[in-house]
């Protein structure tokens, strides 16, 4: 009896071990969700089909939509109007730096009440203020000198008409004043060119540039080329099918002849 009980206990132990091993194996083999280690970074993947600006890498919206100003494709196809305007002002170029397509632009000036000041350094501002002050003083002196000269000349002409002779000091003063006046005019012309350049800079700074989309004709041409290529491929496939059909018919004819001969 004791030996029977010992045999039963040993069998139960072996069965328990095998059951536990099978359960462990099933646990190990079952597909469970494995938690990723915390050291792996979690990145949000955005779909590649989203259109973004090639300058600021942001998407377009209702306030600032994306435009297609040139022939660039892929991720360089779209750009914001404001980003492109700022780039054109800073680079002073009118064409794409990649495909060399000249932008179709429409420029408009802002209203005078919305004009902004030029961004100049302190030294440039001091130079402009000094030159303006000097020119105002110079113009005042020239106008006063002309007035005095004309007044004295009129008196000397009256005296010369009475005497019939104009003295040399009159002609000397006239020549000196004419030379000085001519030099002043040349100097004013050079300085006025500087003022004109400043005025052009101010106008360019306060203009609004609207860049239009690339014309659809170019896109149509590209589309037409692809359409022309596709029918050629289809025609080649049709010709291949036709040749295969003719070959099959060619090989079936001898079979018909053989069948006819057998009947005879």
Curated annotation (Swiss-Prot):
Q: What is its EC number?
A: 2.3.2.27
What are the start-end ranges of the zinc fingers (RING-CH-type)?
A: 45-106
Signal peptide range in chain numbering: none
- In what way does this protein cross or attach to the membrane? Multi-pass membrane protein
Gene Ontology terms, MF aspect: ubiquitin-protein transferase activity; zinc ion binding
Catalysed reactions listed for this entry: S-ubiquitinyl-[E2 ubiquitin-conjugating enzyme]-L-cysteine + [acceptor protein]-L-lysine = [E2 ubiquitin-conjugating enzyme]-L-cysteine + N(6)-ubiquitinyl-[acceptor protein]-L-lysine
Classification via InterPro entries: Znf_RING, Znf_RING-CH, Znf_RING/FYVE/PHD
Q: Which terms does the UniProt entry file under GO BP?
A: immune system process; protein ubiquitination
Give the subcellular location: Cytoplasmic vesicle membrane; Lysosome membrane; Early endosome membrane
Q: What class of enzyme is it?
A: transferase
What is any one of the record's Gene Ontology cellular component terms?
A: lysosome
Q: Which Pfam families match?
A: RINGv
Q: Region (Disordered): which ranges?
A: 15-47
Which UniProt keywords are given for this protein, alphabetically ordered?
A: Cytoplasmic vesicle, Endosome, Immunity, Lysosome, Membrane, Metal-binding, Transferase, Transmembrane, Transmembrane helix, Ubl conjugation pathway, Zinc, Zinc-finger
Can you tell me which residues bind Zn(2+) 1? 53, 56, 80, 83
**Residues at which Zn(2+) 2 binds:** 70, 72, 96, 99
* Record-linked SUPFAM superfamilies: RING/U-box
Q: Which residues cross the membrane?
A: 130-150, 170-190
Grouped into one coarse class, the protein's main location is membrane
Biased-composition ranges, Polar residues, are 17-47
Its UniProt pathway annotation is: Protein modification; protein ubiquitination
Function, in words: E3 ubiquitin-protein ligase that mediates ubiquitination of cd86 and MHC class II proteins, such as hla-dr alpha and beta, and promotes their subsequent endocytosis and sorting to lysosomes via multivesicular bodies.
Domain remarks in the Swiss-Prot or TrEMBL record: The RING-CH-type zinc finger domain is required for E3 ligase activity.
UniProt cross-references to PANTHER family, sorted A to Z: LD02310P
This chain's protein is named E3 ubiquitin-protein ligase MARCHF8
Q: What is the lineage of its organism?
A: Eukaryota, Metazoa, Chordata, Craniata, Vertebrata
